[in-house]
Amino acid sequence: MVPRKQKRKLLEQPQPVINRWFAIKAIRISRPYVESTLRVYLRAKLTYQERKRSAALTSALDTTIKELKKLNASKFESLKVFFNLSLFFLIAEKDIQAVKVDALSHPDAWKRNLSLRIMLLVIHEWDMAKVAPANKLREAYEAASISQELREEMTEAFRKINKAHSKAKQLLAHARHATIAHRDADAMLQYETITNLDAMETMKVAASFYEGADLFIQALPKVMLEAGSIHSLLKQYSRHA
């Protein structure tokens, strides 16, 4: 309600000022309802879109696990490196995909925020150097006779993914314990850090990760095909015979 005195002053203003005031008031009142409606629409749309991606990821994950188990008893070391790299990546992408819809559209603000934090944590902790250091990857390329063109494609994919990784580290540099592990002794600071997490910045990081992920998904199967050719398998086998 507008106090009577303020209402009188408002009505004394020029008509454009009055119109603007009522427009702002209407936006403030309707905004929560508009946002809620948009989230419902977005949730339905994303759930439909992500269903196909989720099924594809699950299938790829199951196949990769099955093949890697077979390879672990073989002497094809380069193929092991590439399949292990694939599994490492697929697990991270599956985690992000599992919370993506909730991060963007869950009706509960806290659950949206929690999903955002999980996405950031996955990208923050995701470190390709752990599973495939540059020297190990280079050796695998050489042993499997991977073409220079495919090596460059992989390098570009890694560059984009590492860029997202760096951004995630920046966003969580001073707030990781509060936003994820709840280790900060200052509970109010912890609460403010969690609730003030920038959703748009988080989604930009995720978008950057997916940009690299798309390149990676295109390049890695081609690398694995080359590594699985007769010529490559014979070369790998002879190195460890």
Regions found by a protein language model. Name each.
Residues 174-181:
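Long, charged low-complexity segments
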Residues 184:
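Carbohydrate-active enzymes and regulators
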Residues 1-171, 191-241:
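Amphipathic alpha-helical interface segments
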